[in-house]
C-alpha cells in the first residue's frame, strides 16, 4: 500500500482495456473483400470442416472471418460485412461474416433464428 506522499509524487497507473476485435477499430461492423474462402478443422475434441474467409477490410486490416450457417455463396472478391465474435474451437478466428448483408446471402430454408442468418420470412 503506497503512502499519500508516494501517490502525490506518482499517481496510479490506469489499467488499459484490451479490445477483443482490434481490426474493427471501435466500429460495430466493417466492410471488406474476400481474398480467400476455404475450410479448416476445429480444435480437439470437435471434428468438422468449418467455413472461413480471409477478408481485407476497408481500413487495410486482413482478418480471418467465420461464415456461419449451412452453405454459402462466398468466393474470392465477394464484398462482405464483418462483425466481431470469436469461434471458440477455431484458433485465430475472432470475426464473423454477417449473413444477408452485401454479397453474403442468407441461409436457405432457415425457419428458426432467422435474424442471425439473414433469412427472410417465408
UniProtKB/Swiss-Prot annotation:
GO CC, one annotated term: small ribosomal subunit
GO MF terms, alphabetically ordered: rRNA binding; structural constituent of ribosome; tRNA binding
Entry's Gene Ontology BP terms: translation
Disulfide bonds: none
Region (Disordered): 1-45
Modified residue annotations for 3-methylthioaspartic acid: 89
Subunit structure: Part of the 30S ribosomal subunit. Contacts proteins S8 and S17. May interact with IF1 in the 30S initiation complex.
HAMAP family hit by this protein: Ribosomal_uS12_B
Protein name: Small ribosomal subunit protein uS12
Lineage of the species this protein comes from: Bacteria, Bacillati, Actinomycetota, Rubrobacteria, Rubrobacterales
Originating gene: rpsL
Amino acid at each position: 500500500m503506497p503512502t499519500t506522499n508516494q501517490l502525490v509524487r506518482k499517481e496510479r497507473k490506469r489499467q488499459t482495456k484490451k479490445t477483443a476485435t482490434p481490426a474493427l477499430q471501435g466500429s460495430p461492423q466493417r466492410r471488406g473483400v474476400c481474398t480467400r474462402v476455404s475450410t479448416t478443422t476445429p480444435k480437439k475434441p470437435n471434428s468438422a470442416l468449418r467455413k472461413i474467409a480471409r477478408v481485407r477490410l476497408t481500413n487495410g486490416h486482413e482478418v480471418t472471418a467465420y461464415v456461419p450457417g449451412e452453405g454459402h455463396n462466398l468466393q474470392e472478391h465477394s464484398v462482405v460485412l464483418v462483425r466481431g465474435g470469436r469461434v471458440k474451437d477455431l484458433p485465430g478466428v475472432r470475426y464473423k461474416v454477417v449473413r444477408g448483408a452485401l454479397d453474403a446471402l442468407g441461409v436457405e430454408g432457415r425457419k428458426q433464428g432467422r435474424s442471425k442468418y439473414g433469412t427472410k420470412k417465408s
